[in-house]
C-alpha cells in the first residue's frame, strides 16, 4: 500500500486532529444526554367494553369509540353482561389512541402496541394448556375530532396464552389474576394521522373451538410505544449535519485517489465503499416521513444499517489481510471470499427475518412471526444461523489479527538488517495497523459498554440540576462516534501526496527481485515521521 | 328546583343527620348517590373538596363507581373475622359510628380507601374516561405536564397523576383540622397510596432492528388490587399503637419497647372495641347471626367467631350449579344439583 497521510503527519498535527475529534464526540453525547428526551415513550391503555346492539353484520362496520361525544354504550364488567344476556360476539373492546387532549404526530415515527390480558382465576373456568386467543381486530384513523373513522386494517389473529398462577388453586384465591406474558399486537411503521381507533372482538365459536378454554378475561390492556417527537427532531438534525460532513470527506478522498498515477488498491476501494455505506445510512430520508405516509421507513432503516455493518465487518477483514506483510496474494477481493461469505450469509439471514416480520407488517400491522409455531421456528432458525455466522466471522477475524501480530513481531526482529527504504516501509505498515486496531477496539468497547448501561439503568440520571437522558446519549453518542471513525479513517488513510526521495533509485539498484514486490513506494519527508513512529522504529531496532 | 315530597324528606333527613353528628371521610358517601353526583348535596365535604368536585365531575363519577371495588376488597380481607368490614347502606356514613374511634380497623379502612381511589383513577385514566390525567391541555397538539410536552418527550404515568389527585382530594379535610385524628388519617392515607405504588411492576419490551434489544422501552404496570389488599392486611396485623409527641407534630409509639412507625406502617390510637357484642356507642354490630365454620381452627371457627356463646345449626337444602361449561365473557351452561348442607350461625347475645 502506498504511504498514507497518517505516516507522514507530524505528532503535533495528529494530536490536534485527535482532540478535535474527541470534542465532536463529547458534543454528540451531550446532544443526546441534555437536549433530547428519552428515545421512546410508553402509554398505558385500558380497553373499554362496548356493547354492539346491532344484530346484522353489514358491510360497513360501525366504529365504537370509548369516549368523546359519540361514545359507545358500555358495560363495566362481565357480570353486568351476564345479567343483560349479552353474547361474547357482541362485546367490542375499544381503544382510542392517543389519550384525551393529545394528538399523535408524524414525529413519532412508529407505533408499537403490546397486549396484556387480565384473566381471573376461577376453579371451574381455568385456562386450558396451550390455549390460544383468537382476536378479530380493526384499526381506523381520522385526522380531526369531527370526521368519520376510516378503516386502515382488519385482521383475525391468534396469540398463544402463556399464563402462570402463582398462588394455590383454591376457592379462596378465586378472583386473583393470572400472571400472563406480554403479547405482540401491532406495529405501524409510520404515524401519519392524529387519532387512531382499535375495535377488538374475541369471537366465540364452540363448534370450532374458537376462544374456548381461555379463562375468565376481565380486561384487555394495551401499551403503546412510540418514538418521542423531541428525540426524532434531534436525531434528524444530527443526520442532516453528518451527511454533508462525511460526503465532503468522501469526495476529497476520491480526488486524492484519482490524482495518483496508479489505479487504487483494494484497501482504498474498501475504505471508499465504507464511506458510501455510511453516507447511505446518514442521508436523512426520514424527513419525508414527516410529510408522507411511507410505512416502509422502518424497514428501509434496518436495511441501511445492515449494509453498513456488513461493509464495516468486511473492511476489518480486508484491512487485516492487506497488512499481512509476507502474503504475496493481495490487492484482490477474491483472496477474502472465505471470510466474507459468513458476513454476507449472516446479513442475508437477518434480512430475510426482517422481511418476514416488518415486511409482512407493511400489509398487516397485526402480524407477528412469533404468533405461530412455524413462524417461531423459522425466526429462530434465521437468528441461529446468523449467530453462527457471527461466531465464524469473529474466529476468522481473531485468527487474522493473530497472524498480523505474529507477522509484525517476525518482521520487527529483521528491521535493523534492512535497507532504509525497506525498514521505513515496514514501519509504516506496522504503525498503520496498530493505530487502526487501537481505535477500532476503543470504538467497539464504547459501543458494548453503552449497550450494557442502557440495558441495566433506568434510562436517565440526575446530574446536578439537570436530567441526563442516558439512552438518548447512547444513541447519539455511538452514532456520532462511528461517523467520526469513518471520517478519520478516510482522512488519515488517504494516500499521501509527498514526493519520493532519492532513495528510490538506490533501492532499485540494491534491491533483489523478491523484495521488489513488497515495495510499491518509499517514504521520505523533511519533517521526519511522528514521535510514535520513531519510537516504534527505535523499539524495533532494539 | 321542584322537589317531590319524598325528595324533600330525603334532603331534610340528610341535613338533620349532618348537623347531629360529625362525619368522617364523607366522600365515601358519593357511591350511594350513584351517577347523579351533586357536589353541594354531599354532607361533610369541605369547601376545597366541593370545589374539586365541581371542577372534575367525571373524576367524581369514577370515584363513586370505584367505591364498590375497595369495599369489596376490604370485605374479602376480613370475611372470616368478627369485624367483616360490613357497611350499612341506610346510614349516611358507610361504616356507621365504627370509624369515630381511632382504632386499628379505622386505620385499615382509611388506607384501603385511599389505595382504592388511586387504583380507580388510574384505571379511569387508562380508559380515557378522564380528560386531565397526565397532560393538561395547552396549545393544539402540544399537551404538556410537569414532565414536558406529549409530542416532545411524553407525559407522566397515569398512576402519578392519580396519586397526586387522591392526595389533594382526600387529605384536604384532614389538613384543615389539626388534631391527632387528622394526623393519623393523613398517615394512613399516605400508607395506602404507597401500597399501590409498591405493586407497580416494571415491564419492558425489546424492539428495534430485527427485534433485537437495540431499543428497550419500559413502563410501570399496575398489579392486581388484591395484592394491595393483602399487603395492607399484613400492615393491619402489624399496626402500631401511637400517641402524639409532646410537640403535636408527629407520633411516638405508645409502648417504648415497640418500634417507631415508619411511613409504610398503619397507626392507631385506641384499642378496638369488642366486636362480639352489639354496641351502639362503638358502632359494633356483634357477631350474632354470622355464619361460622364448625370444622375450622381459624378466626372463622364457631368457637372464635361466636365468642364462646355457641351457635345454631340448621339443615338447608339448596340448589347449586355443577358441571358448568363456561364461555368467555357472558355465557355459562350448568346442571342443577341438589344438596343439603349444615349451616352454623352464631347465637345472638342474651
Swiss-Prot record, chain B:
Palmitoleoylation is required for efficient binding to frizzled receptors. Depalmitoleoylation leads to Wnt signaling pathway inhibition. It holds the Pfam family wnt. InterPro entries: Wnt, Wnt2, Wnt_C, Wnt_CS. Keywords: Developmental protein, Disulfide bond, Extracellular matrix, Glycoprotein, Lipoprotein, Secreted, Signal, Wnt signaling pathway. Transmembrane segments: none annotated. GO terms for molecular function: cytokine activity; frizzled binding. This is Protein Wnt-2. It comes from Danio rerio (Zebrafish).
Amino acid at each position: 500500500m502506498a504511504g498514507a497521510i497518517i505516516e507522514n503527519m507530524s505528532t503535533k498535527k495528529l494530536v490536534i486532529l485527535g482532540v478535535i475529534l474527541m470534542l465532536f464526540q463529547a458534543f454528540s453525547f451531550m446532544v443526546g444526554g441534555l437536549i433530547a428526551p428519552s428515545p421512546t415513550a410508553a402509554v398505558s391503555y385500558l380497553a373499554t367494553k362496548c356493547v354492539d346492539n346491532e344484530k346484522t353484520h353489514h358491510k360497513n362496520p360501525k366504529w365504537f369509540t370509548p369516549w368523546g361525544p359519540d361514545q359507545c354504550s358500555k358495560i363495566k364488567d362481565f357480570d353486568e353482561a351476564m345479567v343483560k344476556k349479552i353474547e361474547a360476539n357482541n362485546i367490542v373492546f375499544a381503544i382510542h389512541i392517543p389519550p384525551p387532549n393529545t394528538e399523535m404526530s408524524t414525529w413519532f415515527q412508529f407505533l408499537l402496541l403490546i397486549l396484556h390480558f387480565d384473566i381471573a382465576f376461577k376453579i371451574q373456568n381455568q385456562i386450558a394448556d396451550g390455549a390460544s386467543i383468537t382476536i378479530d381486530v380493526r384499526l381506523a384513523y381520522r385526522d380531526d375530532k369531527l370526521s368519520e373513522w376510516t378503516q386502515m386494517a382488519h385482521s383475525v389473529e391468534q396469540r398463544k396464552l402463556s399464563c402462570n398462577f402463582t398462588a394455590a388453586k383454591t376457592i379462596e384465591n378465586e378472583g386473583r389474576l393470572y400472571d400472563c406474558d406480554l403479547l405482540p399486537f401491532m406495529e405501524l411503521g409510520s404515524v401519519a394521522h392524529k387519532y387512531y381507533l382499535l375495535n377488538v372482538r374475541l369471537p366465540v365459536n364452540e363448534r370450532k373451538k374458537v376462544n374456548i378454554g381461555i379463562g375468565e378475561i376481565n380486561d384487555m390492556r394495551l401499551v403503546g410505544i412510540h418514538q418521542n417527537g423531541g428525540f426524532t427532531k434531534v436525531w434528524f438534525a444530527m443526520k442532516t449535519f453528518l451527511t454533508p460532513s462525511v460526503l465532503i470527506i468522501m469526495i476529497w478522498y476520491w480526488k486524492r485517489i484519482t490524482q495518483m498515477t496508479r489505479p487504487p488498491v483494494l484497501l482504498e476501494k474498501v475504505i471508499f465503499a465504507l464511506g458510501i455505506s455510511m453516507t447511505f445510512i446518514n442521508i436523512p430520508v426520514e424527513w419525508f416521513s414527516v410529510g408522507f405516509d411511507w410505512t416502509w421507513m422502518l424497514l428501509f432503516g434496518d436495511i441501511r444499517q445492515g449494509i453498513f455493518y456488513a461493509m464495516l465487518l468486511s473492511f476489518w477483514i480486508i484491512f487485516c489481510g492487506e497488512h499481512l506483510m509476507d502474503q504475496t496474494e493481495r490487492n484482490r477481493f477474491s483472496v477474502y471470499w472465505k471470510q466474507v461469505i459468513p458476513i454476507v450469509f449472516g446479513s442475508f439471514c437477518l434480512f430475510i427475518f426482517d422481511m418476514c416480520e416488518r415486511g409482512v407488517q407493511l400489509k398487516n400491522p397485526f402480524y407477528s412471526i412469533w404468533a405461530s409455531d412455524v413462524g417461531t421456528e423459522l425466526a429462530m432458525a434465521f437468528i441461529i444461523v446468523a449467530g453462527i455466522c457471527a461466531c465464524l466471522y469473529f474466529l476468522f477475524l481473531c485468527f487474522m489479527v493473530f497472524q498480523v501480530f505474529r507477522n509484525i513481531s517476525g518482521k520487527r526482529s529483521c528491521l535493523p538488517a534492512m535497507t532504509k527504504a525497506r525498514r521505513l516501509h515496514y514501519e509504516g505498515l506496522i504503525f498503520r495497523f496498530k493505530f487502526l486496531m487501537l481505535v477500532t477496539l476503543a470504538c467497539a468497547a464504547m459501543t458494548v459498554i453503552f449497550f450494557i448501561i442502557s440495558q441495566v439503568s433506568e434510562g436517565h440520571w440526575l446530574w446536578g440540576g439537570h436530567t441526563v437522558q442516558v439512552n438518548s446519549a447512547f444513541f447519539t453518542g455511538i452514532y456520532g462516534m462511528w461517523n467520526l471513525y469513518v471520517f478519520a479513517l478516510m482522512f488519515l488513510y488517504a494516500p499521501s501526496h509527498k514526493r519520493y526521495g532519492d532513495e528510490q533509485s538506490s533501492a532499485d539498484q540494491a534491491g533483489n527481485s523478491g523484495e521488489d514486490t513488497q515495495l510499491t513506494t518509499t517514504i521520505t519527508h523533511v519533517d521526519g515521521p511522528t514521535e510514535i513512529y520513531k519510537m516504534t522504529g527505535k523499539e524495533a531496532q532494539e | 328546583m321542584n322537589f317531590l315530597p319524598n325528595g324533600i324528606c330525603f334532603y331534610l333527613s340528610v341535613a338533620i343527620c349532618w348537623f347531629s353528628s360529625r362525619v368522617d371521610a364523607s366522600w365515601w358517601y358519593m357511591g350511594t348517590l350513584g351517577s347523579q353526583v351533586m357536589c353541594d348535596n354531599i354532607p361533610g365535604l369541605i369547601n376545597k373538596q366541593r370545589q374539586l368536585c365541581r371542577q372534575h365531575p367525571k373524576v367524581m363519577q369514577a370515584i363513586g363507581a370505584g367505591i364498590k371495588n375497595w369495599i369489596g376488597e376490604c370485605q374479602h380481607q376480613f370475611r372470616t373475622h368478627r369485624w367483616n368490614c360490613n357497611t350499612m347502606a341506610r346510614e349516611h356514613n358507610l361504616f356507621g359510628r365504627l370509624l369515630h374511634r381511632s382504632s386499628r380497623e379505622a386505620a385499615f379502612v382509611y388506607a384501603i380507601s385511599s389505595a382504592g381511589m388511586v387504583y380507580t383513577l388510574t384505571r379511569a385514566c387508562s380508559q380515557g374516561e378522564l380528560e386531565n390525567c397526565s397532560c393538561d391541555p395547552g396549545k393544539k397538539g402540544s399537551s404538556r405536564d410537569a414532565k414536558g410536552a406529549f409530542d416532545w418527550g411524553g407525559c407522566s404515568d397515569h398512576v402519578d397523576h392519580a396519586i397526586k389527585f387522591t392526595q389533594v382530594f382526600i387529605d384536604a379535610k384532614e389538613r384543615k383540622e389539626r388534631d391527632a385524628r387528622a394526623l393519623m388519617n393523613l398517615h394512613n392515607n399516605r400508607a395506602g397510596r404507597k401500597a399501590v405504588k409498591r405493586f407497580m411492576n416494571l415491564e419492558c419490551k425489546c424492539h428495534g432492528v430485527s427485534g433485537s434489544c437495540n431499543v428497550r422501552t419500559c413502563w410501570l404496570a399496575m398489579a392486581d388490587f388484591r395484592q394491595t389488599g393483602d399487603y395492607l392486611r399484613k400492615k393491619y396485623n402489624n399496626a402500631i399503637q401511637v400517641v402524639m409527641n409532646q410537640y403535636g407534630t408527629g407520633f411516638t409509639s405508645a409502648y417504648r419497647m415497640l418500634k417507631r412507625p415508619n411511613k409504610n406502617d398503619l397507626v392507631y390510637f385506641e384499642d378496638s372495641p369488642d366486636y362480639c357484642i352489639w354496641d351502639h356507642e362503638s358502632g359494633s354490630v356483634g357477631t350474632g347471626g354470622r355464619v361460622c365454620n364448625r370444622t375450622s381452627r381459624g378466626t372463622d371457627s364457631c368457637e372464635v367467631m361466636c365468642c364462646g356463646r355457641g351457635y345454631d345449626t340448621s339443615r338447608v337444602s339448596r340448589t347449586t350449579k355443577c358441571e358448568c361449561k363456561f364461555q368467555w365473557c357472558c355465557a355459562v351452561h350448568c346442571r342443577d344439583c341438589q344438596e343439603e348442607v349444615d349451616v352454623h350461625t352464631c347465637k345472638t347475645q342474651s
